[in-house]
C-alpha cells in the first residue's frame, strides 16, 4: 500500500522505481502472448523496419550494453524477430535488422502501450506531460553515448 506522507513517498528514486516496476508488470502481461520480455520489446521497438543498426548504436538507443544485448539478440534471432549479420569489411561490426516476422509484430506490439495506458487512472494530457517531463529529465541527465 502506498503511504503518501512516508519518507519514501518523497524520494524521486523510489517513485521512479515503483512506477517503472508496476508499468513493466502491466506490459509483461501482454508480452507473454509474444514470448517477449519487456527488454526484448524495447529492443524490437527501437529498430526501424528497414534499418540495419550496429549493436553499439542499438545499445545507445535503449541504454543497454553489449553484454546485455548479445544474449537478448540471440534469443530474438531464435524467435525469428531479428537477424544478426557481420559486415564483410569488418567482421567485428555486427548489424541488427528486423526479419519479416519482426516487422509484422511491431504493429500489435505498439498497441500494447495504448492498452497499458487505458489501465491507468490518468488523462491523455497528464500522460503527455509526464512523458515530456521524463524525456527532458533523461536528455539533461543521462548521456548514453561514449562522448563523455
UniProtKB/Swiss-Prot annotation:
Entry's localization field: Cytoplasm
All residue ranges annotated as the HTH marR-type domain in the record: 9-139
Domain of life per record: Bacteria
Induction cue: Transcriptionally activated by CvfA.
InterPro entries with a match to the protein in the record: HTH_MarR-typ (IPR000835), Transc_reg_Sar_Rot_HTH (IPR055166), WH-like_DNA-bd_sf (IPR036388), WH_DNA-bd_sf (IPR036390)
Alphabetized UniProt keyword annotations: Activator, Cytoplasm, DNA-binding, Transcription, Transcription regulation, Virulence
One GO cellular component, as annotated: cytoplasm
GO molecular function, one term: DNA binding
Pfam families per the UniProt record, alphabetical: Staph_reg_Sar_Rot
PROSITE patterns in UniProt: HTH_MARR_2 (PS50995)
Residues in the DNA-binding region annotation: 55-78
Keyword Transcription: yes
Protein task: Activates transcription of virulence factors alpha- and beta hemolysin genes (hla and hlb). Also, activates RNAIII expression, a central regulator transcribed from the agr locus.
Family: Belongs to the SarZ family.
Protein name as it appears in the record: HTH-type transcriptional regulator SarZ
Lineage: Bacteria, Bacillati, Bacillota, Bacilli, Bacillales
Name of the gene: sarZ
